[in-house]
Each structure stands twice: as structure tokens, then as C-alpha cells.
Amino acid sequence: MGRQLILFPMSDQSDHPLILLWHRRDLRLNDHLALAKARQKTAKIVGVFCLDNKILQAEDMAPARVAYLLGCLQSLQDHYQRLGSELLVFQADPVQLLPKLANTLGAHGVTWTLDTEPYAQKRDLAVAQALRERGLAIATEWDQLMHHPGEVLTQAGSPYTVYTPFWKNWSQLPKTSPVPTPKDLQGLTPAEKEKLAPLEPLAIPQLADLGFIWDQPLPLTPGEEAAEQRLDWFVAHGLEEYQQNRNFPALDGTSQLSAALKFGVISPRTLWQTTLEAWEQSRSEEARASIETWQQELAWREFYQHCLYSFPALAQGPYRSPFQEFPWEENQDHFQAWCEGRTGYPIIDAAMAQLNQTGWMHNRCRMIVASFLIKDLILNWQWGELYFMQTLYDGDLAANNGGWQWSASSGMDPKPLRIFNPHTQAQKFDPEGEYIRTWLPQLARFDTGDLLTGKLTPGSRRSVNYPEPIVDHNQQQREFKRRYQLVK
């Protein structure tokens, strides 16, 4: 698709000044490139969002993620109204809806921001074709990435498949500054709104209206304002200590902006600009090292997005072909125990409790539980990948797939065979047992050393109805290594 897909460029002069801004993973008006460019042509810009059943009814949809999405839509609609326009919401196929909507309103054209996911790319091409057939203008922008996939390439002109050289190139490229937010917009006239009735616009639905149940508070309040407030908090209290605190799940040491980035509630340009300002104000090498570490995490996100764009088959299975035939176990009981946090390993079960209760899990714990599923239970990493997508409120195809393939040593930028010992990980990253006690309160009274090493007596476990370990770590890691050598 390249940098931009402009099949019918938008002219500067038009008898039909209305432009529709089709939102997907860009649920904001601040620092929005497509909006800023459209505003140069007209003030009459109306937002559109399609609740797409192909996405909502997919097996990898998480109730918590839909809850966050709906909250972001409400925030976005409020922002449009403050500027004088509106966000139109439909439950419809965008390929069918957008041409009808544009024609009904006499719009000049439709603008949107591009996506790296395979489904989104196919959908966008179909929408563009349908709009072009009706003579409607189209403008698109890469806006969820600092650098689009065609911009960061090896000297041979091919996509990177290893992170470190990607980072070296990516970090040296000039970065675009945030773009201004329009001060005002114009919405539809009463007569135009009356024309919408046959297309059945919706009030933003409740979660239950879409068939989902989620009654827990979300880790991050939906919407632009909450994301910007969290960023401000993180810069003031967490960014300069990020390097030393980010791996300790009991600490509030990460930005927790992953869901906001997933849905484009905040722009990567805004985040990058914030890091530059923090760098200038920092007073120690340690602080600057932390800032650069967080910048590298932003680049990891883009690396996985670029990989998915360039190698869409990643979404279907292992990148490294030998792993297509890996002899996985098929033990459903072990998988259910992992999903439900009943493995008998406190750090694993605490992490899964956090995921199931909040829709979010600390990144260090994501690596620990992924390693356990793959290399202790010897279960197919794709089972875990799907379960994460079914539960994470920040679930992102590229990042989730990239993380799981990294853990399985089957994807891009594989590390040498690495098996996390859950007890060692607990001792290193939850040394006081605070995280375990938070999410497994039934174990709170036991000795910290026993919690971290899992050396709880059978009687202690029975007294709080906590299970025995479902596998022996040392035995299972030997077996995984044996199988790994067969397909390596």
C-alpha cells in the first residue's frame, strides 16, 4: 500500500466541502495527521466509526477490549461535539456503508489512517475501490507509526527481521512533530441529519448490547484525556526510573499506555516528542538511559508492526518453518489450569489472576507465563496467543504475535533457546512477594521464601485450596530441549 493510498486526490476547491473521517485505530482528534490535512481543505469534517461484526464476532475478541473501545468512542464523540461536529456510529460493513453514507450526505470524499494488519489492508482496498467507483475522493495517511513500513529498510531495500539493526536505523530517522488540533469544525445540518435515518446511525451502544460482559474497572480510563493524564503522570513519576522499575510487576513502573496506543487514543508522535522534552530536562545519565530504554520500547512496537505488514503470514503461525512440525503436547487440562491460574506455581497463577480480573498483565509476567506454557507445559504457543487476545484489553495482533513468537523462539529476531525458571523469575522480580500476595491473597500469610520458590507444603496448599504443581519444571525443560533439538 506504500506510504499513502490516494486513489482520487482531494482537491483544494470543491462544491461539496464535507469530508468524512473514517476512524478505526485512531480514536482521537489531538495530533491526528489525516484530520489536520483535511482541515486545511474544509472545516466541515464529520467522524465515522463502523462497529464491524467481522471484528466484534471474531474468536479473538476480548470483552475488556470492547469495553475500552466503547469508552473511547464516547470520549471521541464528546470531543467532536466540543469542536462543533459529530461522530457518526454504525454497526455495519464499512465496504457497504461508507459509499452510501458519502453519497447520502453529498460528501466530497473520505479520509482515513492506514493499518498494518492483514484484515485491515484487505478491507481498506475494498472500501477504496467502492468509493472510487462512485467518484469519491480518497486520502490516507500512516498515522499509527512514526515511520511507515516502506521507510525503514535494510541497505538491500528489504524489511528488517532483527530488532537491533532496525532500532539503529529507526532511531536515526527524522521524526515528525505532533500536528495541531483544529480549534473548530462544522457538523451536519438538520436537513443532512434527517437523510441519515435509512442508514440507521446508532447511539454508542452499551457493552451488553454487543453481547459482551465486563464489569471490572479498566486499568486505564478510556479516551484522550485519560491517556494524556497518564502520560503526564508517567513523565513526572516513572520515566526517569523506567529502566530500573519496569521489570517489577508490584511497582507502577510502566506507562500503561498500551491500550491507548492500540486504539490510537494517543499518537506515537506525541509520545516521542514527550521523550525528547524529558531528555532535555533530565539531569543524569541514569535518567537519560531510562528515557532511551522507553524509546526502544516504542521502536519494538513499530518493529512488530513492520514485520506483520511485510510478512502477514506471521499471523497464521511460526515464522521459522521447522516449528511448523514441533511435537506439542495436547493436554487440555494443563491448558485450562494455565488459563485459570491453577498451575501450582504462584508467580504464574498470580499473573493469570491479574489478566483474568483486570484485562491486563505486566509485561515481565507476560514473558514468564508464555515461557511456562511453551517450555514447561510444552503446549502450542498459538493457544496462549489466542487466549491473550481473548482477555487483554490492550490486545494488539502485531505486538501479541511478536511477543509469543519471541518466547517460542519461532519468530522474528529469535533469541537463543531461553527457558525462564518461574521460581527464579519470582525471586528476581517479586523479591518481597508483594505481587503474588496481591493477586493470590489466599497465600498472603505464607513465608515469602516459600512463595517465591513454590516450596509450600502439601498441607499448606490444602489449607487454602491451592493446587500442587501440575508439572516439574526441571523435568519439563529437559523434555522441551530434547524436542527442540529435533526440529531446530
Curated annotation (Swiss-Prot):
Site (Electron transfer via tryptophanyl radical): 328, 381, 404
GO molecular function, one term: deoxyribodipyrimidine photo-lyase activity
Cofactor field: FAD; coenzyme F420-(gamma-Glu)n
Details of cofactor binding: Binds 1 FAD per subunit.
SUPFAM superfamilies (alphabetical): Cryptochrome/photolyase FAD-binding domain (SSF48173), Cryptochrome/photolyase, N-terminal domain (SSF52425)
Family according to the record: Belongs to the DNA photolyase class-1 family.
Designated name of the protein: Deoxyribodipyrimidine photo-lyase
Protein's organism: Synechocystis sp. (strain ATCC 27184 / PCC 6803 / Kazusa)
Biological classification of the source: Bacteria, Bacillati, Cyanobacteriota, Cyanophyceae, Synechococcales
Gene that produces this protein: phrA
